[in-house]
Amino acid sequence: MAIILAITNSKGGVGKTTTCANLGAALSAAGKAVLLVDNDPQGDLTKVMRSDPKSLKYTLANLMNAVLDDTEPELFVNRAVIEGAGIHYIPANSKLAGVSSRLVSANEQPLPRRRDRRYSL
């Protein structure tokens, strides 16, 4: 069974990215399948994973927009998930800020519950 952890805090500079990256690395080293999701428009976790947020064509924003548009997010998953240093991750960039505003203005409708069970985190 997959375990889902969210590392959150509304304050910046408290170690969310560092904690997430190090926890992911430790779990990967222990043989666990790890999927990290960068949910920050600044793309700090994406940078830690050695990707340039500005150069990425497919990111978390594509996946979230697909869900909001009721299209198939599966079309973007294989393109958005990147493998780096033995860890899979979904990158983020400034396009995620636009998704945030869409979420705020969206009707209160339940989103479909889809989950890929290949990952431990």
Each model region followed by its residue ranges:
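P-loop NTP-binding core
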Residues: 1-121
